[in-house]
Design a protein with these regions (language model features):
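N-terminal periplasmic/intermembrane-space "pro-region" immediately following the signal or transit peptide
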Residues: 3, 19-65, 411
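Outer membrane beta-barrel
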Residues: 46-73, 78-215, 232-247, 326-338, ...
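Outer membrane beta-barrel transmembrane domains
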Residues: 326-328, 334-367, 372-382
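Outer-membrane beta-barrel "beta-signal"
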Residues: 235-247, 362, 366, 371, ...
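Transmembrane beta-barrel architecture of outer membranes
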Residues: 95, 124-126, 190-192, 233-237, ...
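Detector for outer-membrane/organellar transmembrane beta-barrel domains
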Residues: 239-347
Length: 411
């Protein structure tokens, strides 16, 4: 195993050197690198401060979401038999983000954002700086999105639905306890360092090392693995995307851009070494396809996770997978219709049974597109389970009927 990791590291370093050799032109960074993963700033001057020379830029931004949600659960979908069928319903503030982004010295971009709608370590949503050695070789350090999954890498304020696919965000089911939070398919925000770049305006690569503890932890808490003492128990993640029509925007459809034609095909992989406090290691792989064509947006994505338990646990491996396809179309320049079909093997492949979750939605934009109304309805069905008990357990904590309306304001 140790020889395998050494070989992979050598191959990665070799690939990075080759990528750098393809792009030797020195170029000052431009405003397209001034990004925040919250709201799109492409082509928008807005409210900003800059020097006359343009080598320093400072842009504040904000995103506020207010939602109303109705969730109705089956009796079998409730964690307690005494709970009411209608639960987790009412009004909420999913996100209330205030941040600033910018550039300095024509080499460094930066971003800092706070989210008071969250608690604990998640109050600090992002804090990073990015050094652009050249377009094909950039280094980012701090707290930011890990390079895995189109659903998460999309700009937060430009998603097709107000809720991300459940196959990406809901935790898996295990027949035994862990020493840590049970994982989901996604890896989300984390603390770490990443090398990334764009080559020939068609190839994008991202390779990083992270804590693997997620958005809620802002401190160093990791150690070395038990089974492989030479390996730090961190998250190792990478993504490679091919964009045949040029650089792909992170939007899932925008009224600002109804005449574009962009496509992306990407593969990603991550290894969270003994992530659950030395209980299990999570290996994830993903494949994604996205296409924006004029008023159309289409995405299809699948992901697989293997949980390998440590020797002390004495448990067999468990495998899980999920996938979704979604499409959006601007019926008018301000009105976007949306459809999604989401599938989740939540209880592991050896148990059988799937959750299938179709959804329909609509987005409407007001006031120069700074105000956005999103509505959606999702149904949770189950199929292929061996017993009624398996069927009941697979849907625990997930509403049979979910309806959400959300207003979002950005600047």
């Amino acid at each position: 195993m140790k020889k395998l990791y050494i070989a992979l590291t050598a191959a990665l370093l070799s690939a990075t050197i080759q990528i750098q050799a393809q792009d030797t032109t020195k170029k000052e960074i431009d405003d397209k690198y001034v990004e925040n993963d919250v709201v799109s700033l492409a082509g928008k001057k807005g409210f900003s401060f800059s020097t006359k020379a343009g080598d320093f830029l400072f842009k504040p931004y904000a995103l506020v979401q207010a939602s109303a949600t109705y969730n109705r659960y089956d009796d079998q979908g409730l964690e307690s038999h005494y709970a009411k069928n209608v639960a987790n319903s009412g009004f909420a503030i999913p996100n209330a983000i205030l941040g600033f982004t910018g550039k300095a010295f024509n080499k460094v971009t930066f971003n800092l954002s706070l989210n008071p709608a969250k608690s604990g370590g998640a109050l600090l949503q992002q804090a990073w700086f990015d050094i652009a050695i050249k377009e094909s070789f950039r280094i980012r350090a701090g707290k930011f999105k890990t390079p895995f999954m189109h659903a998460y890498l999309s700009t937060l304020g430009e998603t097709l639905f107000p809720v991300l696919p459940y196959s990406a965000t809901q935790s898996i089911l295990l027949p035994y306890d862990l020493n840590y939070v049970i994982p989901s398919m996604s890896t989300g925000f984390d603390l770490g360092v990443m090398v990334h770049g764009l080559v020939n305006n068609k190839w994008e690569y991202q390779v990083g090392i992270f804590n693997g503890t997620g958005i809620d932890v802002n401190t160093a808490t990791k150690t070395n693995c038990d089974d492989h003492e030479w390996l730090p128990s961190l998250l190792y993640s990478g993504r490679l995307a091919f964009m045949p029509k040029g650089e792909m925007p992170n939007s899932q459809g925008s009224p600002e851009n109804l005449n574009d034609d962009k496509m992306s095909i990407a593969v990603s992989a991550s290894y969270n070494a003994e992530a659950e406090f030395l209980s299990a290691s999570d290996a994830r792989v993903g494949l994604e396809f996205t296409w924006i064509k004029n008023r159309w947006y289409f995405a299809a994505e699948g992901y697989f996770m293997n949980m390998h338990f440590t020797k002390i646990m004495q448990k067999p491996d468990k495998n899980f997978w999920g996938a979704y396809a979604q499409a959006g179309y601007f019926i008018t320049p301000k009105l976007q219709g949306a459809l999604k079909y989401d599938v989740f093997d939540r209880n592991a492949t050896d148990d059988g049974g799937l959750l299938n979750m179709p959804a329909v939605g609509m987005n409407y934009y007001f006031f120069n597109n700074n105000l956005k109304l999103q509505v959606m309805y999702q149904y949770m069905g189950r199929t292929g389970h061996a017993t009624q008990g398996d069927r009941d357990e697979d849907g625990i904590g997930i509403a049979r009927h979910m309806a959400t309306a959300m207003l979002q304001f950005t600047f």
